């Protein structure tokens, strides 16, 4: 029994290493962007695709994970995914221009897309139900630590080593995961269903077109007719996918899920949350370093409280939902989140560090509550047969939303930068960007108002 328990714990540790590496990577890059842009001879305001490319690659390849694991086996796919992630990390460190960095981030994202879903699948297949909670908790802890350490470690490495090390640190962690997985993870295969390649290509190319179009829209040096053409083609491809998948239950992302009202509203709300607030972790390091004159290390320490308060608040969210219900909690959190983003518009280099930290903790608390609430509500009414696909769609929307949120924030910031053309007007450009981004909360609250008072009651412990 002890040997079996150790084997399950070992599998959880391997999954935890992968999740730690991935969650660390999600936040470590932001504080290093100004340093990277300087080395690559690109304006820091044009570096957003280095972040967006990763999120987009993850979103595109998540739908293939179950098929790949069934066809090739969990161990084979997991090791290949970690190796791909390491390969992408090395390529990032070796990048000599923005284009090569973006390509390397895509490689990283492909590895990241397969890494965690397959690790979770391996745990579900191998760990007995009575030990499943312990395995999840161990893995989740690593996922919570990564975002806290990411900004701090990223800033420290930029100052005391070089930005290349924010990618190179993945090599020992990933190598350990590859070696350890051989002794604790079985190569379990299954029946690989026929993959919907038509749907995958329509969906993938549509997302790439929209994301690339939005990115080019924020860069004035590109031909506007080409930019709008790419954007329109991307939208048309996604519309075509919707028509294709409407009556096709075997589509890679079946639209029948959207017949469930709470799932539909949860997806819509997720998009508006990302548009209103996901650009904040991208904008803040730029503002701290380029406008306030803070070092990368100071910037990293200031960003850490966002993740820290988010983790600390997790234990209270259940009580909040039990007391107030989903609709009231979500609308209140959305309005408070808007307030936190608006208040960032009044931050300047004279602002006290105490006020800045309080402001960012306010933002982190709201984001923690709203994401946990909307994500549990979105999948809460799905049937057991739909829950796996529903979780996949939710993960895709979250990654796409991050990319869209950063792209839109970048567009808004660049518009204000060109409007306030004087070099000393950069603080105003950031202020107006935060104010404009907060307007998406109007659409968010509109979508949340469509929830019913008792939605999610079956997920609560009623007082």
From Swiss-Prot:
The UniProt keyword set, sorted, is: Cell inner membrane, Cell membrane, Membrane, Transmembrane, Transmembrane helix, Transport
- Identify one Pfam family in the record: MFS_1
The region annotated as signal peptide is none
The protein here is known as Probable transport protein HsrA
Topology in the lipid bilayer is annotated as: Multi-pass membrane protein
Listed InterPro entries: EmrB-like (IPR004638), MFS (IPR011701), MFS_dom (IPR020846), MFS_trans_sf (IPR036259)
Annotated NCBIfam families:
efflux_EmrB
Name the family the entry cites. Belongs to the major facilitator superfamily. EmrB family.
The regions listed as transmembrane in this protein's record are: 10-30, 49-69, 82-102, 107-127, 139-159, 165-185, 197-217, 225-245, 267-287, 298-318, 328-348, 354-374, 393-413, 429-449
Assigned GO CC terms: plasma membrane
